[in-house]
Amino acid sequence: MAPPQGSRAPLEFGGPLGAAALMLLLPVTMFHLLLVARSGPARLLGPPPYLPGPEELWSPWALLLCLTWLGLQAALYLLPARKVAEGQELKDKSRLRYPTNGFQALVLTALLVGLGVSAGLPLSALPEMLLPLAFAATLTAFIFSLLLYLKALLAPASALAPGGNSGNLIYDFFLGRELNPRICSFDFKYFCELRPGLIGWVLINLALLIQEAELRGSPSLAMWLVNGFQLLYVGDALWYEEAVLTTMDIIHDGFGFMLAFGDLAWVPFTYSLQAQFLLYHPQPLGWPLASFICLINAVGYYIFRGANSQKNTFRKNPSDPRVADLETISTATGRRLLVSGWWGMVRHPNYLGDLIMALAWSLPCGVFHLLPYFYFLYFTALLVHREDRDERQCRQKYGLAWHEYCRRVPYRIVPYVY
């Protein structure tokens, strides 16, 4: 199906060849990390310790567990929400509605897991199933992406994403053709964006902590820090779930393999890498250094939450006393750009806070292995790339106002560095 005239966006991620390469490279990288984390040398660079056979990857029980997890999170998504938020205005001038009950889903999941563990659920066996679970999640993401692509073939032009309707099957399958694929009020992209992957990440971390307690008598201080830092991050994302409605993932990118694999497989199985590493490679950590690492994470979170809250408050009500005195630049679209407060320091202060927290998550793992720092390195590359995409879109959208903003706020993420 040819894309509607005038709706094409510039190709990203290296076009069809880049999309094909990423669809192969991302799962391979994920499995490489899972294998290396449990190996003796734990070397990030170099070949994996061994290549798993089909019997080690495929497990019908793992697939059943994966689908059950998705079903549970979908059921929690459908529960009454404390608030229903409206999304951004679409091409047809309508606005979709979204339940903001993600934090409720996290709490209910914790209660269910707690009841299960008290009833004898062997949660500590989960780390031994990470390979087949990751394979099941990858398979699910591929099949789900195919169904999304087929559904998008029947979608009206107004429902298509700006960049996912190039006419090239591989590229559109990767990036996603439809912007907001839904069945009735169930929004697949919004559901997958935070729920299954982030809550699954916390669950895997908890299972690794419990297994370490069984192996060594009690969880290490390093394991407690990693679990605590990352639980705070996930809890924050789900408490402020409404904020995701203004992100690039929701308002610009279609829902294809890139987001489906990222949400369902990449996030839970690679973001838990530090906890995986600590289970197989325990690291000594004293209270003085632990306190310093906590301070680093607190600084990162303070910047991250402060910047995001300031932006969200300003978007909702520019006259709010907390943001009314901030300096702004008017744009031709009628929106105003903040040039003071957090957003006068750098163009993406939330990214700066994110990166500081990412570093704090890796530091409990010591400094003698590169593997636990994969997330920090990967996330740096991801945010720099995302910032570049955002830069191009804002330049096109705001024109001269954006050039003035860049003159007033010259640094993108790190003050005086980048």
Swiss-Prot record:
Q: Say if the entry is tagged with keyword Oxidoreductase.
A: yes
- How would you summarize where this protein is expressed among tissues? Highly expressed in liver and brain.
* Enzyme Commission number, as recorded: 1.3.1.70
Q: Which pathway, per its entry?
A: Steroid biosynthesis; cholesterol biosynthesis
Membrane-related topology note: Multi-pass membrane protein
| BP-aspect Gene Ontology terms | cholesterol biosynthetic process
- Does the record's keyword annotation contain Endoplasmic reticulum? yes
Top-level taxon of origin: Eukaryota
Q: Which residues span the membrane?
A: 13-35, 62-81, 102-124, 129-148, 255-277, 287-304, 355-377
Listed Pfam families: ERG4_ERG24
Q: Where in the cell is it found?
A: Microsome membrane; Endoplasmic reticulum membrane
The protein, known as: Delta(14)-sterol reductase TM7SF2
What species is this protein from? Bos taurus (Bovine)
Q: Which gene encodes it?
A: TM7SF2
